[in-house]
């Protein structure tokens, strides 16, 4: 009896599977790093694990051998809470990947918005916002208006941020 040793096949560059990183959301990172000195007012940043919009920034020079420090004041994009952070300008901070999408309101069901994209895909996991915006959406829906809802998503959270009348065809 002969013994066979099977050699492991290693794919060549041409045989390797092409992976498309541009497509869908699966595996897409929720944040990306950016140097503090590159952050800008009205941009986004993660502070204490929350996605925030920068409302104020200032840079302070420190002593002879220190680094310039960046002071950031930002508001949580989902609950409006104020956060502050101080970091050396050369340090990296996480920036959330923030996506804005518009949907047509189809229905309001048990505190959730039933939404539809322009290609007919439905989405029903966005909560009816509380307060003034929620009232505006409910009243407009009850009046039979065609409403377009702006939904912002970042770091696995979503919120309805605005509503407007759909353009009449």
UniProtKB/Swiss-Prot annotation:
Key words, A-Z: Cytoplasm, Elongation factor, Hypusine, Nucleus, Protein biosynthesis, RNA-binding
Protein name according to UniProt: Eukaryotic translation initiation factor 5A-2
GO molecular function annotations of the record: ribosome binding; RNA binding; translation elongation factor activity; translation termination factor activity
Annotated gene: tif51b
Protein role: Translation factor that promotes translation elongation and termination, particularly upon ribosome stalling at specific amino acid sequence contexts. Binds between the exit (E) and peptidyl (P) site of the ribosome and promotes rescue of stalled ribosome: specifically required for efficient translation of polyproline-containing peptides as well as other motifs that stall the ribosome. Acts as a ribosome quality control (RQC) cofactor by joining the RQC complex to facilitate peptidyl transfer during CAT tailing step.
Family assignment from sequence similarity: Belongs to the eIF-5A family.
Segments traversing the membrane: none
Note: There are two genes for eIF-5A in S.pombe.
InterPro entries attached to this UniProt entry: IF5A-like, IF5A-like_N, NA-bd_OB-fold, Rib_uL2_dom2, Trans_elong_IF5A_hypusine_site, Transl_elong_IF5A_C, Translation_prot_SH3-like_sf
């Amino acid at each position: 009896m002969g013994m066979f040793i099977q050699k492991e096949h290693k794919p060549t560059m041409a045989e390797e599977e092409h992976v498309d990183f541009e497509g869908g959301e699966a595996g897409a990172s929720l944040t990306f790093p950016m140097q503090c000195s590159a952050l800008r007012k009205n941009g986004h940043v993660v502070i204490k694990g929350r996605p925030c919009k920068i409302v104020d920034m200032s840079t302070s020079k420190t002593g002879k051998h220190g680094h310039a420090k960046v002071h950031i004041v930002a508001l949580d994009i989902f609950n409006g809470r104020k956060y502050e952070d101080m970091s050396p300008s050369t340090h990296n901070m996480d920036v959330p990947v923030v996506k804005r999408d518009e949907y047509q309101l189809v229905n309001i069901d048990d505190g959730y918005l039933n939404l539809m994209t322009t290609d007919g895909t439905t989405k029903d996991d966005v909560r009816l916002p509380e307060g003034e915006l929620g009232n505006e959406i409910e009243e407009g829906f009850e009046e039979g208006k065609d409403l377009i809802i702006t939904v912002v998503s970042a770091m696995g959270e979503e919120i309805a941020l605005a509503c407007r009348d759909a353009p009449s065809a």
